[in-house]
Design a protein with these regions (language model features):
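Basic, flexible Lys/Arg- and Gly-enriched helix-loop patches that mediate nucleic-acid binding at interfaces
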Residues: 1-278
């Protein structure tokens, strides 16, 4: 077998996404034949020996791919393991005979739809920012959100680290004294983004539930349970990610073209610039 990039092999073996593999390699946690490797290095899966965090990884060929929709309950962390001993989502899919990992994340206090897979290329496509796959959340905040706060959230707010969020769609479900329940549709995935957005406008999130990601709906799935995605759902997510990447590339090219376009003389037409109007 020909040599392949190590981060590609790691993602295909279900260790993590390709981006996460690059980070792990950069941290010096990966060795091939006993030697540390760099991002971009290659190995022969048939000949070379791979270790991650000093654990040998036995490379499986032609393994079955799994694509799951999991209802992550509150109280579980979205990691493969946790140094603090907290419950992880891996415990909820322990019966799957493959090394799965989460596609994206939900913080410990949030609940709802979480995709899981052992297909690194799929995870990379779905989570990459250029894909722009929409995610639907049901968010309960306190105190009651007024029109100005909702307008700020939908228009994009500046977070505590100085970055500004993209505009998002908001639909108020219930509005009563002391609290508001709304549906928010986002196309980006900053860390704890919705909670930080609400904090920026003076609101506290008391419940956050993801109900959909692209074509995949949480539906009647119960907390802690999972189901396999249909072929149509897997295809739909891939198609949405590809469309998003194409739109991102097109926008970037248009922006570059506009930046290169020659500008006219400052002040308009030089011939008429000195004329006095009576």
């Amino acid at each position: 077998m020909a040599e392949e990039r190590i981060q590609k092999i790691m993602s295909e073996q279900g260790l993590c996404s390709r981006r996460a593999a690059e980070q792990i390699i950069a941290e010096g946690r990966v060795k091939v034949n006993g030697h540390p490797v760099k991002v971009g290095d290659k190995m022969d899966p048939n000949r070379d020996v791979l270790h991650v965090d000093d654990e040998r990884i036995y490379i499986q060929k032609n393994q079955q791919m799994y694509y799951l929709a999991l209802y992550k309950p509150r109280g579980y962390v979205t990691t493969a393991s946790d140094e603090l001993g907290r419950k992880t989502v891996m415990e909820l899919v322990a019966d799957i005979p493959a090394r799965l990992y989460p596609v994206g994340r939900l913080d410990k206090d949030s609940e709802g739809l979480l995709l899981m897979t052992n297909d690194g290329a799929f995870a990379q496509a779905v989570t990459h920012p250029s894909g722009g796959i929409s995610k639907l959340y049901r968010v309960t905040v306190q105190p009651r959100a007024d029109e100005a706060q909702i307008l700020k959230l939908s228009s994009g707010v500046v977070l505590d680290d100085g970055t500004k969020t993209m505009p998002c769609a908001i639909n108020v479900v219930t509005d009563e004294p002391g609290r508001t329940v709304m549906e928010m549709t986002l196309k980006e995935g900053k860390n704890r983004e919705i909670r930080r957005m609400c904090e920026a406008v003076g609101l506290e999130v008391i419940r956050l539930k993801r109900n959909a990601e692209g074509v995949v709906k949480l539906g009647m799935l119960q907390p802690g349970k999972y189901r396999e995605l249909t072929k149509a759902e897997v295809t739909g997510l891939r198609a949405a990610a590809a469309k998003g990447r194409a739109q991102t590339r097109s926008a970037a090219l248009q922006s570059k073209a506009a930046a290169r376009r020659p500008r006219g003389p400052v002040g308009g037409n030089k011939a008429s610039a000195g004329k006095k109007h009576k």
